[in-house]
Amino acid sequence: MEETKYSSQQEIEGACGSDASLNARGSNDSPMGLSLYLCLASLTLVLFITALDILIVGTIIDVVAEQFGNYSKTGWLVTGYSLPNAILSLIWGRFASIIGFQHSLILAILIFEAGSLIAALASSMNMLIFGRVVAGVGGSGLQTLCFVIGCTMVGERSRPLVISILSCAFAVAAIVGPIIGGAFTTHVTWRWCFYINLPIGGLAIIMFLLTYKAENKGILQQIKDAIGTISSFTFSKFRHQVNFKRLMNGIIFKFDFFGFALCSAGLVLFLLGLTFGGNKYSWNSGQVITYLVLGVLLFIFSLVYDFFLFDKFNPEPDNISYRPLLLRRLVAKPAIIIVNMVTFLLCTGYNGQMIYSVQFFQLIFASSAWKAGLHLIPIVITNVIAAIASGVITKKLGLVKPLLIFGGVLGVIGAGLMTLMTNTSTKSTQIGVLLLPGFSLGFALQASLMSAQLQITKDRPEAAMDFIEVTAFNTFMKSLGTTLGGVLSTTVFSASFHNKVSRAHLEPYEGKTVDDMILYRLQNYDGSHSTIGNILSDSIKNVFWMDLGFYALGFLFCSFSSNKKLIIPKKDDTPEDNLEDK
């Protein structure tokens, strides 16, 4: 097999898949007119079911825990999905750069649908978690690729609006998810929370295949080419044409196998330590300490390997596709890492707020899953409004950092107000405190991704691959924050609840695990102002205090973000992309 080297933007775009051009205008592969809007609609549908799978789970936790009897494992209904979602984001970006966007997205949808089917048919908590993990593998690709594809179909000026449109899928799912999930759980069965992904995913595949033309080929021509390739395949031909040494080098260096393995193992061990601490094992036990310390060390070593050791072992330094997943030139660039830390911190706090806002109404007021989900409508409506406003403002005025700071300020104020939500607060307070966190995330997330993309040097030969990987890294940080938010919030709640119950010496709860305490509470509800109701309220408030800390750190990073603005062309300039003046 011949050695592949790249020396021009055209060759780089070929390495990224021919549909990976940064300059959408003038690319034969980019949809135009109605096809563009339908293609964006298909990507939005894909992101909708991806987000739905995160948010709908919050409404089934108590029902599933009661059916399978493992409340402490319910945290893994979120983590089992969001952890592979985070870890594999970078891999999907690299995978798409090799085989192209279209094939990667279709594969990701199929994996996601398979995971949803497994979860829907689950007969035990472990099987349900396994289905969530499989769905998370596919969901990781969907989140990464939808933003990459959407951003590369239009010019730079229209990217903020596209990012906002795609982000609205998450916000709409946050409204619909708890309502649909609650309705299914209360009136039908929680299994339909996963069955619903199947028809929506199928529709998204059809729309995408009909509107997105990779290599300027229609879907029928692509199917014909694929059949021809498969029919001409023979093992002897494969054996003679493939250099297995180069194949192994491709796996190790194109996909950064060792860096990925170290990073994944580190994150998994660290999150296991947080999950087991205070539940299965005490915090000072050797098992928990080993998980936490070893997890941190492996993660640090993965960074050392990618930043300093990868190039020393790289057999083909001139091959642009042989590069680490976490490229020091990009990831360690202050302007990029700062805005991605904003994404990570705000998503950590926001996910904790979302999960325990639902738990607040279910555990304290014994609300059904459906009614508890309705309380999230304020936080989601404001998220949609802010996301759209952010995209329009950036497209028209080019502002990025002001929106980032504005979102950070609203996040701190909103998180502070959420600590006022207790079992004695009024209905208006319970609704009002949920408004600002939605505004915060809507403004900040779009601005952070746009700010990161603006740092790419467009005249570099590998600019197209840089664009993919910066976008994938942002998705990685977003998913990692969501994952950590779910685990940490459960850890804080469980530890706080267990300690407070132990000090109160409540006879029905003494000697029970947190799982058993929660189940006993659900089966023997004694009001929102009882002793156990007060303890639950205080424990959930501690989660909200933790979220406030993450928002405060996020605002601090917002203040140090780049001052770069989106360049707005003069009115008499020719529209720069295929979303302009349609």
Swiss-Prot record:
One annotated GO molecular function: transmembrane transporter activity
Subcellular location(s) of the protein: Vacuole membrane
Ranges of the Cytoplasmic topological domain: 1-44, 102-104, 154-160, 213-256, 309-329, 394-401, 452-469, 561-582
Gene Ontology biological process terms, A to Z: L-arginine transmembrane transport; transmembrane transport
Glycosylation sites noted in the Swiss-Prot or TrEMBL record: 70, 423
PROSITE patterns: MFS
Gene3D superfamilies: MFS general substrate transporter like domains (1.20.1250.20)
Record's signal peptide: none
Assigned protein family: Belongs to the major facilitator superfamily.
Function: Transporter required for vacuolar uptake of basic amino acids.
Protein name: Vacuolar basic amino acid transporter 5
Protein's gene: VBA5
